[in-house]
């Protein structure tokens, strides 16, 4: 399970050090993909394969489903952390998420999100006030 907030730095080569507590879960390979809110999502390979299989079952005649699948597949990069637990984020991913040197990695239960630190701060300021109301609306009786 991926939980918590971490603040690694992006180096000049586009490498980001993953939090040590997640490295074992990601050692077998991981998938970095574009996510909502101009962040990046990092999935263990097996978890991403399940997501991709579910997405590929959507009707190919539905233009929204085709667009989602195209964006998912085209915007995904397979990575294997190096001995120091670093992954290299592509220039396209760094641009998409507007990543600067200061990044935030957050646990999102079954995957990680990578944010630019300022973008994450802005997101939190905008959405934190609505957290209680949003959780009631979005999750209903689940929690």
UniProtKB/Swiss-Prot annotation:
It comes from the Bacteria. One of its GO terms (biological process) is negative regulation of DNA-templated transcription initiation. GO terms for cellular component: cytoplasm; nucleoid. This is Transcriptional regulator MraZ. Forms oligomers. The lineage of its organism: Bacteria, Bacillati, Actinomycetota, Actinomycetes, Mycobacteriales. SUPFAM superfamilies: AbrB/MazE/MraZ-like (SSF89447). Pfam families: MraZ. Residues 5-47, 76-119 form the SpoVT-AbrB domain. One of its GO terms (molecular function) is transcription cis-regulatory region binding. Its main location: cytoplasm. Keywords: Cytoplasm, DNA-binding, Repeat, Transcription, Transcription regulation. Transmembrane segments: none annotated. It is found in: Cytoplasm, Nucleoid. Belongs to the MraZ family. InterPro entries: MraZ, MraZ_C, MraZ_dom, MraZ_N, MraZ_sf, SpoVT-AbrB_dom, SpoVT-AbrB_sf. PROSITE patterns: SPOVT_ABRB. It comes from Mycolicibacterium paratuberculosis (strain ATCC BAA-968 / K-10) (Mycobacterium paratuberculosis).
């Amino acid at each position: 399970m991926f939980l918590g907030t971490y603040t690694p730095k992006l180096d000049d080569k586009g490498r980001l050090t993953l939090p040590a507590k997640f490295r074992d879960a990601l050692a077998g390979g991981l998938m970095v993909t574009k996510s909502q809110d101009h962040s990046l999502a990092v999935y263990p390979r097996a978890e991403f394969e399940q997501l991709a299989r579910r997405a590929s079952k959507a009707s190919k005649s539905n233009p929204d489903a085709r667009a989602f699948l195209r964006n998912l597949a085209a915007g995904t990069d397979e990575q294997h952390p190096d001995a120091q637990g670093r992954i290299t984020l592509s220039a396209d991913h760094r641009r998409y998420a507007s990543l600067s040197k200061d990044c935030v990695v957050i646990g999102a239960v079954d995957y990680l999100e990578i944010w630019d630190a300022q973008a994450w701060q802005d997101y939190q300021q905008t959405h934190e006030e609505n957290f209680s109301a949003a959780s009631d609306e979005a999750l209903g009786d689940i929690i």
